[in-house]
Amino acid sequence: MRQSQILPTRQQTVHRSHRMSESLLPVILCLLSAVTVAATNMFVKRGGDVLTARMAVAIVMGLSVLPFAPFVPTPPPETWSLILISVVVHWFYQFCLVRALHRGDLSLVFPVMRGLAPLVTACAAIFVLNEYLTVLQSAGLLLASLAIIVFALPTGQTATARKLDRSALVWALLTALGVGMYAVADTRAARAMPDPMTFVVWLFLLDWVGVTVVAVIQRRGQIGEAMARQWKGGLAGGMLGTISYGLAIYAYTLTDAAVVTALRETSVVFAAALGAIFLKEGFGYRRIIAAAILSGGLLLMQAGA
């Protein structure tokens, strides 16, 4: 057999390298998104007043994309319904997120609400996007879900603390539902746009309205004073949030929605670490092991793609 038949040609090598680069791009985007989304939620939780902090983040995200609005393509008329669906789903997610962060530790509720999201996304994507997981991806998803359950188990608190944890867990589960819903809705909308940046801009321009209305009603005459205490964290969290979800939306156009969501959920490790370091929240060896298993399950999902 000739050597040319054994060794790959230069064209084959370049093609394989190109395919590897294409497959790595969504991974890199999602991991960057994971770090920034964990930091965003830390700023929201650190602000104390979670509702006002989330409002500040949403407003900054809207303002950050405003300069780009004149330069992105106008959404086609048939896509406006998709944009509005995404906005409403994001409002639902934000409300549940605020309640979850208000009730529980960042290192507890964040892994649950983010880690279960791939399961919701995978189920919804079957019906909405006609996307199916492979056997290996399904195994990784189940492994990750089991790790999350272990991560979220109580750590011997008093009866009152356990009650608060159960309440936080319910809101975290609803937030996971919201994450899965917006992942599928945003994937469908972003793919229908002439450019992903169009969807990023219009989503963030409209997204801040819901949480702002709720915050103004809840805080009434104290909203100005509350915002004065939150603007620093809101500025940092808002800029990070824009980067985080902007990267995710671009990744949605490159690969399956469930894969993107799963890769972003490696943020649970970053969130737990940030909660322990900056917010003085408990962590422990069990959560360290569970977080490692969770990451392994999510990586297994990517390996099966």
Predicted regions and their residues:
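Specific alpha-helical transmembrane segments that line the substrate/conduction pathway
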Residues: I85-H90, H102-I149, T198-L206, A257-I277
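Short hydrophobic alpha-helical membrane-embedded segments
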Residues: R54-L63, V112-A117, G178-G180, M239-L240
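Hydrophobic/small/kink-forming positions within alpha-helical transmembrane segments
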Residues: A34-A38, W91-F92, G115-C123, G180, ...
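Hydrophobic alpha-helical transmembrane segments in multi-pass integral membrane proteins
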Residues: V65-P73, T121-L133, L177-R191, L240-A257, ...
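Hydrophobic transmembrane alpha-helices of multi-pass small-molecule transport proteins
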Residues: G62-V65, A122-V128, L136-T155, R286-A305
